[in-house]
A protein has these predicted regions:
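Acidic/histidine-rich, metal-coordinating catalytic segments
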Residues: 133-148
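Active-site-adjacent loop/helix surface patches within enzyme catalytic domains
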Residues: 7-132, 136
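Alpha-helix boundary/interfacial micro-motifs
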Residues: 53, 81-82, 153, 158-160
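A charge-rich, low-complexity, intrinsically flexible signal that marks solvent-exposed coils, linkers
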Residues: 85-88, 149-155
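Short, Lys/Arg-enriched N-terminal segments with co-localized hydrophobic residues
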Residues: 1-5
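Short amphipathic alpha-helical patches
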Residues: 91-94, 151, 162
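Acidic, His- and aromatic-enriched active-site or binding-groove loops in soluble protein domains
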Residues: 60, 154-173
């Protein structure tokens, strides 16, 4: 179905992996980016919607730029795991998680597609505006769980996102 907020096709494929208690909009402070880290997109969708996996994000951006809605935004998706940013711990409760289809470091890590990044920018802008997310609270999974996670990885276009008014970028030169 077409979204009212974006031109990209959005597919609903709900995951059972979220807290049943609704949260308040004002609790949402972070935007967390992930890669799926699975051999195929089909495998990623299967894992993110399987009750036994106990993992899901709010959104998945497919290779072709389509968005799959996995968990409604006002519910806590299980995407961050053991996590910390500054003094805040367990970021699932205060974040929106976006998975981007990519095999990741263990399965042939590749560049993210232009369609994925275009969709990510639109979705991120929408979420940033809706929840008033601060630039320094737009993070990668590796930022909040550095001892156990690598995603979204070194091929993730942080500088390009920054140029599109998403997140921060430190130019060291």
């Amino acid at each position: 179905k077409k979204s009212l907020i974006m031109k990209e096709k959005m597919i609903i494929n709900y995951s059972p992996n979220f807290d049943l208690k609704k949260r308040k909009r004002k609790q949402i402070k972070f935007l967390i980016f992930h890669y799926t880290g699975m051999r195929s997109e089909k495998d990623a969708i299967k894992r993110l919607t399987n009750m036994q996996s106990e993992v899901a994000s709010h959104y998945l951006i497919k290779n072709n730029g389509e968005i799959i809605i996995l968990v409604p935004e006002l519910y806590t998706a299980w995407h961050a795991g053991v996590s910390k940013w500054q003094k805040k711990r367990q970021l699932n409760k205060s974040s929106i998680g976006i998975e981007i289809s990519n095999p990741g470091h263990k399965n042939g890590y590749k560049n993210f597609s232009k369609k994925q990044i275009k969709t990510l920018i639109k979705l991120s802008r929408y979420l940033i505006k809706k929840y008033k997310i601060k630039k320094n609270f737009i993070l990668g999974h590796s930022d909040i769980a550095p001892d156990r996670k690598l995603d979204p990885g070194e091929k993730f276009p942080w500088e390009f996102l920054y140029k599109n008014k998403i997140g921060i970028w430190h130019n060291l030169s």
